Design a protein with these regions (language model features):
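Hinge/cleft segment of the Venus flytrap/periplasmic-binding protein
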Residues: 30, 170, 278-324
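Extracytoplasmic "Venus flytrap"
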Residues: 33-60, 65-82, 95-100, 171-181, ...
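Short, solvent-exposed amphipathic alpha-helices that sit
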Residues: 45-60, 148-152, 177-196, 212, ...
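Short beta-strand elements in bilobed, periplasmic/extracellular small-molecule ligand-binding domains
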Residues: 58-71, 166-169, 187-207
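Beta-alpha junction/loop-to-helix N-cap segments that form part of ligand/metal-binding clefts
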Residues: 72-128, 231-234
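Hydrophobic alpha-helical segments within soluble ligand-binding/sensing domains
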Residues: 78, 139-166, 209-210, 255-259, ...
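Hydrophobic alpha-helical
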Residues: 95-112, 186, 198, 202-262
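Flexible loop/hinge segments that line or gate small-molecule binding clefts
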Residues: 105-147, 256-264, 269, 320
Length: 324
């Protein structure tokens, strides 16, 4: 491994803080090796991503190394892992492109002749717009947040009462642009159906959000539906609706274990699942097909799986198997 100046320190750092999910077995030197760099492994979402990468490695007969910082250090924590991955000269790298912080290292990978695909995030908006046009052209595997917001809302609208009533959109992380994109899609669908809506800035704390949602519903009796832009918003909304026997449909993005339980008991009406297992799986599939057959990586939208009480039993089995 060739890393400028502080090589041994970085190698030691990687040995301590990264997780290798598919070590290179003896006699497999002819197999292409791919790196998948993630921001975290402390969230079940990323464990599921890891499972998808591992399965793809087995199915396509390639070596996959899945790495993440030991602590949630955001974009910056992925940079040294990507630099070390480039130095290892793999056949390809899958990058969760969360911001412009990752532009220089992504460009470095492309300059080194390494195949790159993006997964989970391809944040190119505003100040994140990459100067390197090659990055914009990279294949992306993941959920189109804005389109998913529109698809979810259109599917959910028939559960609302007819006539004029308001939808409350609860954002647990107001500074996260990804949730702004989700909200944009939700609002487009609501506007098209002529449903007024209001925004509620919440937090990542479900206990605090329960109080905020309770206050909002008590202050505005015209609210007939709630969209939580993430589980920290939707779970307490569903709890409040259930505890007070209200007939207010609640929709959300992503399906964690708690959200699955609430879909099962009916207090949560609908969710859209971005399918993290498939994000990682198809990212590796793209790289494997390019390395083996020179097939150009393609975009894959994984985020259009609607979950309701009708199919929650299957989804719960999928969650238990580490595939949802």
């Amino acid at each position: 491994m060739t890393v400028p100046r502080y090589a041994w320190g970085r190698v030691l750092f990687l040995a301590i803080v990264t997780i290798v999910i598919n070590t290179v077995p003896a006699g497999s030197a002819e197999k292409p090796t791919f790196y998948m760099i993630a921001p975290s492994l402390t969230d079940p979402f990323w464990v599921t991503e890891q499972n998808g990468a591992k399965q793809a490695g087995q199915d396509f007969g390639v070596n996959v190394v899945f790495q993440a910082p030991a602590q949630d250090t955001g974009d910056a924590g992925m940079v040294p892992l990507l630099q070390a991955a480039i130095a290892a000269k793999p056949a390809g790298i899958a990058i969760d492109y969360t911001s412009k912080t990752l532009e220089a290292v992504t460009t470095a990978a492309l300059d080194a002749g390494i195949a790159v695909v993006l997964y989970n995030n391809d944040r190119f908006e505003g100040e994140n717009a990459p100067a390197d046009k090659r990055i914009r052209d990279l294949a992306f595997v993941g959920q189109n947040e804005s389109i998913s917001g529109e698809i979810l809302t259109r599917a959910w609208l028939p559960t609302l009462q007819s006539g004029p009533c308001k939808v409350l959109i609860v954002n647990p992380f107001p500074t996260a642009f990804v949730l702004t994109l989700r909200a944009d899609g939700v609002k487009r669908a609501l506007d098209a159906a002529k449903y007024p809506h209001s925004d509620l800035a919440a937090t990542g704390d479900e206990g605090q959000n329960l109080s905020l949602i309770s206050a909002a519903l008590q202050a505005d009796k015209g609210i007939c539906g709630i969209v939580g832009l993430g589980n920290p918003a939707a779970n307490p909304a569903a709890q409040y609706v259930g505890d007070n026997s209200l007939k207010i449909p609640v929709a959300t993005f992503d399906v964690g274990a708690e959200a699955a339980k609430r879909l099962k008991d009916g207090t949560l009406t609908m969710a859209i699942n971005q399918q993290p297992f498939l994000q990682a799986y198809f990212a590796v599939a793209n790289l494997a097909n390019q390395a083996k057959y020179s097939l150009k990586p393609v975009n894959v939208n994984t985020g259009t799986s609607i979950v309701t009480t009708d199919n929650i039993d299957v989804i719960q089995k999928c969650i238990a198997a580490g595939r949802c």
